[in-house]
UniProtKB/Swiss-Prot annotation:
Interacts with TP73. Interacts with FZR1. Residues 400-410, 744-776 have a biased composition (Low complexity). It comes from Homo sapiens (Human). Residues 518-532 have a biased composition (Basic and acidic residues). The lineage of its organism: Eukaryota, Metazoa, Chordata, Craniata, Vertebrata. This is E3 ubiquitin-protein ligase HECW2. It is found in: Cytoplasm; Cytoplasm, Cytoskeleton, Spindle. The gene is HECW2. Residues 737-1068 are annotated as: Interaction with TP73. The modification Phosphoserine is found at S48, S852, S909, S1175. InterPro entries: C2_dom (IPR000008), C2_domain_sf (IPR035892), C2_HECW (IPR037795), E3_ubiq-protein_ligase (IPR050409), HECT_dom (IPR000569), Hect_E3_ubiquitin_ligase (IPR035983), HECW1_helix (IPR040524), HECW_N (IPR032348). Residues 847-874 form a coiled coil.
């Protein structure tokens, strides 16, 4: 009875239009407060605020006019000025003036990641269902996305529609109302299943359905007693693809009523707090009944959102059976009385939001009637939702009626009387009627709800049972937004013969064009042909994935994924049964084949699971997009087909769609994958009625030239939307695809500089149907009962899901494109990313290993990415996982520049590029003596100084040799290099000179089978000492160029060719070389430049210096800033050339105060050692870190740790105990670390224990913990971070992180992890950009930092800084950015639109532009991270470091120097350096590639990073402890490690082969701790 009483109260509440609705758990107030406040109340003011007259302190939303006539030329402009906190998920909605429910918006726009607290947008209002009266009053409301709080409302705006004839609408509505108002029908829903529901951070949801009957939207439809019937399904545990087996739910309703279905998560865990709303549908009953004459059918709808800020993904499928209709004259009121209280009380057997129901309850799904649960929802707008922007909406009614088939009558049909009798009998007690027995055995009682009984507890847990009410409340007015409805998708069993008609019949009837968002939403449904589904699904999915827990068997998942994936404009993978060329679109136009329910859905492979993994949660885009994605293609409504070709599609199972064309191209090729949803919306709006083209295009086959579609496996396999949009002429389609192809080609060409592994180069011909893996993965992982924290911080995945279609990726892999347009690959099983395309699927047993282990053992090269970890000594022939995958990337990259490349095998391409980079021109350009030689050639020097393009090219090549591939045929570069050629010498071996038909000489390199106009007889050797520019080579941190110092090495797949790799130093003995540290030389340069008369000295050899003000400023900058300044300017060609003139003076110069310092011991002239450091304590591996800070840094670091100890940081006596499950690493770390107070984090000792492992934490487990956490937490997979623009191993905060659930807490957690690692002296295997470290230190960024975020933008501003812009650039202090889906102008300073940029104020302009660009979209996230960091560490202590130093403290280095390693290794148990086993050991280590060496290091020490000082300073459990190899064990045993003591126990193996095999096995396969 308690339940019924509560239901009654809620029933009453939802009919009160003045009720205040809770929009999200975060906004929960006490229940009492909820019953008092009107939603449209203006901002409440504090009683103490006496300034009630002025509005300066209040948020405002205003319009440019308050009378608007539809069709007028003048735009309606909405202005906002929000004083409170704003968020990327904020939205503005258009409402009827009397509307109080936030969910009943007629149109809405989301803000997106850019934008500020003030701004304006143009709002287009178009005639539609909501404006069918001569005059109607509306208003706009601004809502905060996270809390749902109303920020501001506009005054009343009157919209006039001169085209409407008075009374026509009213008469029509009234007539129809009278006609049907007395006709009650009974219908049953069965075979319900959902696909691709949104996942939480750590858990799969435990979904259940809430279904109810509500009156239609029009005011002429009365509210009757039967309204409020409610059903709740059983709870399906731990799945994103629930199937309610054999459960039936019957209702009776008027034809004018609507059926509302809401999916919620019965979330009973304590943390983290999440939203339980998973999606909703609002479907007119008439639409369902219209299927009766068509035959058996499966309906599929994309789930919609309640509010624009909701993140929803997936779709719902079910069958409808009309069981009876009541006498036409039966009065609904009379029926209501028969139902009596029953209609108010919910089905007792169904889960209740507030009560735990005993598992034994039988849900009489079929029989009982109950009020609809509150939440169900207003949002589900009926078809006619009004959208102001122009997007194509198709009337589902038409579509469904034509395309769907009704199911044959069921064996048991209940008459209305039976139904009512059953209700009467079961009413309060238990819903089990006869039909109950039909209930699926699959839903076991234990899966039933176990909701907390106390509503206050719910509020505390932020699990708002009212949230549901609210949704429901949204008022039975259901905005008819298509988004919500999602088009209806029919799975027809019938043959495809009549499909064509479906499309033709779809009409754009009364669905007005909706806002771009909506359109994106809608656009998403494509059906796939049943024919290809089975093949694709089978081939791509792992064999027989286990059904999800709670589901009896394979879900009938439409293979629509395939089709929908295309949504985005990708071509459909249709394989016409007729055998017609797939390249041509079906004659029928865009008609899509309905996937046959039995064939495609019940394949057994459970594509749905697959998709669920992919889970397209649109969330990633701004809401509008999210809507689109929410209706994953499954909805076949044209709407979706239409514009939305957007990412909504991305949710597709790419596996199915192996041939998809490129999604990207469908969307704007130039748009970054992570664009705000508005962008996408815009795309949708752009082609309101072009759904056809999208579909048609889908059918066409991807041609080699076109960019393959990046298909995102959306979690929902798109249900095959039966209807397809009308298809434009094939000619038009042809043009579209030609245009796309050319755009893609252009894009590929533009990216010709070698791309990172996955970039546009791939576009050339590969369409990876990646999500197939996802499917497989899901099947596997879900089968185990617990889905690994797949999307810990859950981000709207569609945002980034773009897949190139090539051959299908292995199961559970997906290709995405980042915000810089680069392709990377996502492993959904291990939650990792990599730049290399995965090859063969992993062995089955690998999938059963824990995520963190796999993460270390599989292709995840995130931070140990090729560029960071590969040493120059690494043999090219190594093609293991690390660069085996890279081969393809290389191939793709090369294809951008070499069109012929695609005919070469990968290995050929790779070796050719390698040979090219070892060619004489490259060796000459990167030679340390290059500038010296340049000075000796006056004509070449003159050309170099006068040609800025040439200087730029040479600088780029010296920074990253892979750029040579791009510039090698440049006329200026060729002519320049040929000036140095010695034509008297013979050609190098393997070279030949020939002449073309014009008599021009060219050279053939038979080694690489290439030709060039560059004469290879270049001066590669110099008699001058090699120390000329040692500093330049060492300024670059080989391990983790924190800010991408190596320039764009990210654009190529092979190891970077650093400016001066260690191999270029032909030292007499390795130990000597090891002493050569750049520190001394850099210090010498600074000291030399700090001489009082330095400018006079410099002018003696460089007279032009007096006129070169830029160079003088750089010298002065170094004099002021010291070595940090020198580091920053280390790649400046002019400065380097100037310093090269004074090489001897610099080397011989010793400051007076340093004469006695051991660091300045002179080395013999001619020795490659420029300045050996004789202090043994400071020996360090060559170029391990930026030299400039060596001695200073050591002093700072010692002092820093001393102060930490003095202040009691990490000293105890308490312990910070972390008990971690390896397969729930982030979840456990987040919950435990965020549960400690600031004081505990600072004071207590850290003690980490891995569950099920006996090891004691004498630092080994703690080190591995930080290693593993850093690899997961800072992984772009979760959407919090993204790879920087310059490389593929440093990361930065992603603007799209704003769409990750609970993202502020995640960034705070990230900051705490950084702080804990710092005070406990552990290293993180994570490398960030320089601006990130500056943000941690709260240091302002400058122009040089911008290069790490946007290289081209940096170059533009740099050019502007270096050149006179007088009368050249017409700029003002403004910048354009996208807000609420529109490009708006933002002022960089007050009145900036009227302030021109001049030579005088350009410095300020550059500073403001840099600040805007660096902070864009990440200000709040950065603040949260910094806050978490300083909750652990005192800001004053950390402030002693600069950005580069802080990076060294946090991340150490990872470029392994074997000589340093060997020289700092100890031996025990009879081993010594010359022992045969030890020699074999080091030979094996040398044979390892750098990644394997790092694994060995991680195996023995617990981390792949090493301290900045090198191996001499490795730490153990009680201080520094060197790497040690001890003779131990039988030769049959594997080596074992003691991570707390950095010791490797190595048995005395009898042969090198055995040692190598055993060592490799131990390193690659071992990952747990044991206790001796």
């Amino acid at each position: 009875m308690a339940s019924s009483a509560r239901e009654h109260l809620l029933f009453v509440r939802r009919r009160n239009p003045q009720m205040r609705y809770t929009l999200s758990p975060e906004n929960l107030q006490s229940l009492a407060a909820q019953s008092s406040m009107p939603e449209n109340m203006t901002l409440q003011r504090a009683n103490s605020d006496t300034d009630l007259v002025t509005s300066e302190s209040r948020s405002s939303l205003t319009a440019s006019m308050y009378e608007y006539t539809l069709g007028q030329a003048q735009n309606l402009i909405i202005f906002w000025d929000i004083k409170e906190e704003v968020d990327p998920s904020d939205w503005i909605g258009l409402y009827h003036i009397d509307e109080n429910s936030p969910a009943n918006f007629w149109d809405s726009k989301n803000r997106g990641v850019t934008g500020t607290q003030k701004g304006q947008i143009v709002w287009r209002i178009e005639p539609g269902p909501y404006f069918m009266e001569p005059e109607i009053k509306i208003c706009f409301k601004y809502y905060h996305g996270i809390s749902g709080a109303l920020r501001a409302t506009t005054p009343c705006i009157t919209v006039k529609n001169p085209a409407v004839m008075m009374g026509a609408e009213g008469m029509e509505g009234g007539a129809s109302g009278n006609l049907h108002s007395r006709k009650l029908v009974s219908f049953t829903l069965s075979d319900l299943r959902a696909v691709g529901l949104k996942k939480g951070m750590f858990f799969n949801p435990d979904p259940y359905l809430k279904m109810s009957i509500q009156p239609g939207k029009k005011s002429s439809f009365p509210t009757c007693a039967h309204h409020g019937q409610e059903r709740r399904s059983t709870i399906i545990s731990n799945t994103t693809n629930p199937i309610w087996h054999r459960e039936k739910y019957s209702f009776f309703a008027l034809l004018t009523d609507v059926l509302e279905i809401e999916i919620k998560d019965k979330f009973a865990k304590s943390r983290p707090i999440i939203k339980r709303f998973l999606g909703k549908l609002t479907i007119p009953v008439q639409r369902l009944l219209e299927r009766q004459a068509i035959g058996d059918q499966m309906l599929s709808y994309n789930l919609g959102r309640r509010l624009p800020a909701d993140h929803v993904s997936g779709y719902l499928q079910f069958k409808v059976e009309v069981t009876s209709s009541v006498h036409e004259d039966a009065s609904p009121e009379a029926v209501g009385t028969i139902l009596g209280v029953n209609s108010v009380n919910g089905d007792l057997g169904s889960p209740s939001d507030d009560e735990d129901m005993p598992g034994s309850h039988h849900d009489s799904q079929v029989c009982s009637n109950g009020p609809v649960s509150e939440d169900s929802a207003a949002d589900g707008t009926p078809k006619h939702s009004f959208r102001t922007s122009s997007t194509l909406e198709i009337d589902t009614e038409e579509l469904t009626s034509t395309s769907s088939r009704t199911s044959p009558p069921r064996g048991r049909q209940d008459s209305l009387n039976d139904y009512l009798d059953a209700i009467e009998h079961n009413g309060h007690s238990r819903p089990g009627t006869a039909t109950c027995s039909e209930r699926s055995m699959g839903a076991s009682p234990k899966l039933r709800s176990s909701f907390p009984t106390d509503t206050r507890l719910n509020a505390m847990l932020h699990i708002d049972s009212d949230e549901e009410d609210h949704e429901f409340q949204q008022d039975l007015g259901y905005p008819s937004s298509l988004e919500e409805e999602g088009g209806l998708i029919m799975f027809s069993r019938a043959s495809r013969a009549d499909d064509g008609s479906l499309t033709s019949q779809t009409k754009l009837e009364d669905n007005p064009v909706e806002n771009e968002e909506a359109s994106t939403h809608e656009a998403a449904s494509f059906e796939d042909k049943p024919e290809n589904l089975p093949e694709l699904a089978e081939s791509s999915l792992p064999a027989g994935p286990a059904p999800e827990e709670g589901e009896g068997g394979p879900e009938p998942q439409p293979s629509a994924d395939q089709g929908s994936a295309e949504l985005c404009g990708s071509q459909e993978v249709d394989q016409p049964t007729s055998g017609a060329d797939t390249g041509t679109s079906d004659a029928s136009g865009g008609s899509r084949r309905a996937v046959s329910e039995t064939e495609s859905l019940d394949q057994g492979s459970e594509p749905s699971q697959v998709s669920s993994e992919t889970e397209p949660s649109d969330p990633a885009r701004t809401e509008s997009v999210s809507e689109a994605s929410t209706r994953p293609e499954g909805e076949s409504d044209l709407e979706c087909a239409d514009s939305s070709c957007n990412e909504s599609v991305t949710t597709q199972l790419s596996s199915v769609d192996t041939r998809c064309s490129s999604l990207e191209s469908a969307r704007f090729p130039e748009t970054p994958a992570f664009s705000s949803q508005e962008e996408e919306d815009g795309a949708c709006a752009a082609e309101p009625t072009s759904s056809g083209p999208a579909e048609g295009s889908q059918e066409s086959v991807c041609t080699a030239g076109s960019l393959p579609v990046v298909q995102v496996p959306s979690g929902e396999d798109e249900g095959p939307g039966a209807e397809s949009a009308t298809v434009p002429d094939q000619e038009e389609l042809g043009e579209v695809w030609q245009r796309r192809g050319s755009l893609e080609g252009a894009a590929a060409a533009a990216e010709s500089p070698p791309q990172e592994e996955g970039s546009a180069g791939e576009a050339q011909g590969t369409c990876e149907g990646a999500t197939a893996q996802e499917e497989g993965a899901t099947g596997g992982s879900q089968a185990n009962g617990h889905q690994p924290l797949r999307s810990l911080p859950s981000v709207r995945q569609d945002v980034s899901r773009y897949q190139r279609v090539d051959e299908a990726l292995p199961p559970n892999w997906e290709a995405r494109i980042d915000s810089h347009g680069r392709i990377f690959y996502v492993d959904h099983v291990n939650r990792t990313t990599t730049w290399q395309r995965p090859t063969a699927p992993p062995a089955p047993q690998v999938l059963q290993r824990s995520n963190s282990i796999q993460q270390m053992e599989q292709l995840n090269r995130r931070y140990q990415s090729i560029r960071r970890t590969m040493t120059n000594e690494r043999p090219e022939e190594n093609t293991n996982a690390i660069d085996g995958a890279g081969e393809e990337a290389d191939f793709h990259q090369a294809s951008a520049d070499f069109r012929r490349e695609n005919i070469l095998p990968h290995s050929t391409s790779r070796s050719r590029i390698t040979l090219l980079l070892q060619s004489p021109p490259v060796k000459f350009l990167i030679s340390p003596e290059f500038f010296t030689v340049l000075h000796s050639n006056p004509s070449a020097y003159r050309m170099f100084t006068n040609n800025t393009c040439l200087k730029h090219m040479i600088t780029k090549v010296r920074r990253d040799t892979h750029h040579f591939e791009r510039y090698q045929h440049n006329r200026d570069l060729v002519g320049f290099l040929n000036m140095f050629a010695n034509k008297q010498l013979e050609l190098p071996r393997g070279w030949e000179m020939k002449h073309d038909h014009q008599g021009k000489a060219f050279f053939v390199d038979h080694n690489s089978r290439t030709t060039t106009f560059i004469d290879p007889r270049l001066p590669l050797q110099s008699s001058r000492p090699t120390s000329a520019l040692v500093h330049r080579q060492h300024l670059t941190r080989q391990r983790s160029h924190s800010a991408g110092e190596v320039g764009e090495d990210s654009r190529h797949a092979g190891p970077p060719v650093l400016p001066r790799p260690s191999s270029t130093f032909n030292t007499v003995s390795r130990p000597q070389y090891q002493d050569m540290v750049p520190v001394a030389y850099n210090d010498k340069i600074v000291a030399f430049l700090r001489q009082p008369n330095i400018f006079e000295i410099l002018q003696e050899r460089q007279p032009d210096l007096t006129r070169n003000h830029s160079l003088r400023e750089k010298i002065q900058f170094i004099r002021t800033e010291g070595t940090p300044g020198l580091v920053r300017l280390s790649s400046d060609a002019d400065l380097v050339m100037l310093l090269s003139l004074f090489e001897e003076e610099i080397m011989s110069y010793v400051p007076p105060h340093a004469l006695l310092h051991p660091s300045y011991c002179q080395s013999p002239r001619g020795s490659p050692v420029s300045s050996p450091q004789n202090s043994p304590g400071t020996q360090r591996a060559n170029a391990r870190a930026p030299a400039p800070y060596k001695r200073d840094f050591e002093a700072k670091l010692r002092n820093f740790y001393r102060k930490l100890e003095t202040k009691g940081y990490g000293q105890g006596p308490g312990k910070l105990k972390l008990i971690i499950r390896r397969d729930h690493l982030l979840e456990d770390a987040f919950n435990q670390i965020m549960g400690y107070s600031r004081k505990d984090l600072q004071r207590n000792k850290l003690y980490v224990t891995f569950v099920g492992e006996e090891g004691l934490d004498y630092s080994g487990p703690s080190r591995e913990f930080f290693f593993l956490v850093s690899r997961e937490l800072f992984n772009p997979y979760y959407g919090l971070f993204e790879y920087s623009a310059n490389d593929t191993y440093t990361v930065q905060i992603s603007p799209m992180s704003a769409f990750v659930d609970n993202h502020h807490e995640w960034f705070r957690f990230s900051g705490r992890i950084l702080g804990l690692a710092l005070i406990h002296q552990y290293l993180l295997d994570a490398f960030f950009t320089r601006p990130f470290y500056k943000a941690l230190l709260r240091i302002l960024c400058d122009l040089s930092d911008l290069e790490y975020l946007d290289e081209e933008f940096h170059q533009s501003l740099q050019w502007m800084k270096d050149n006179d812009i007088h009368d050249i650039l017409d700029l003002t202090f403004t910048v354009n950015e996208e807000v609420f889906g529109q490009i708006t102008e933002r002022e960089l300073k007050p009145g900036g639109a009227n302030i021109p940029v001049t030579e005088k104020n350009k410095k300020e302009y550059i500073e403001r532009m840099v600040k805007w660009r660096i902070e864009r979209g990440v200000v709040q996230q950065t603040e949260s991270l910094v806050r978490g960091f300083y909750e652990v560490v005192d800001a004053r202590l950390v402030s002693v470091f600069d950005a580069r130093e802080l990076e060294l403290v946090i991340a150490g280095t990872a470029e392994i120097d074997l000589s340093d390693w060997r020289n700092n290794t100890e031996y025990r148990g009879g081993y010594h350096d010359n022992h045969i086993v030890i020699r074999w050991f080091w030979a094996a280590v040398e044979r390892f590639n750098n990644e394997q060496r790092l694994r060995l290091l991680q195996f023995v020490t617990g981390t792949s990073s090493i301290p900045y000082e090198g191996f001499a300073s490795l730490r153990g459990s009680n201080g520094p402890r060197r790497f040690c190899v001890e003779k131990w064990g039988k030769i049959t045993a594997l080596p074992r490690a003691h991570t707390c003591f950095n010791r490797l126990d190595l048995p005395p193996y009898p042969s090198f082969s055995m040692l190598y095999e055993k060592l490799l096995t131990a390193v690659e396969e071992t990952s747990t701790f044991g206790l001796e």
